[in-house]
Amino acid sequence: MKIAIDFDDTLATYEVQRLADMLIKSEHDVHIVTSRVSNEHAQNPRWNDDLFLIAEMLSIPKEKIHFCNLTPKWKFFCDNDDFDFHIDDDAEEVDEINQHSKTKAFHFVSTFDNSGIRRIANKIENN
């Protein structure tokens, strides 16, 4: 399956990094789709160093990192309609993606006991 994961407050968290690692090891095609601006549009050319560091740590290549440059993510998923799932901490983005695109978006909420991430992992594996 082709799976997108938001970065800020999502893949930036350890629990989602563990999920991404599991998905990659299970041979899912994992991408990063972020609202952030790319380095070309950022005021600081090192703006995305944290993102690139985590992507490298997870072996997610740069060509699988998609910057939406502050436009709504649902537009990205309408233009790139081959994604099966997207995981995001922004409930509004999740609702818009589910409303306007074929991609099934899941709302990630960090929990003390990791139950939220286990619920998402189970939904992905059972589809």
Question: Can you say where each PLM-predicted feature lies in the sequence?
Answer:
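Alpha-helical substrate-recognition element adjacent to the catalytic core
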Residues: M1-T71
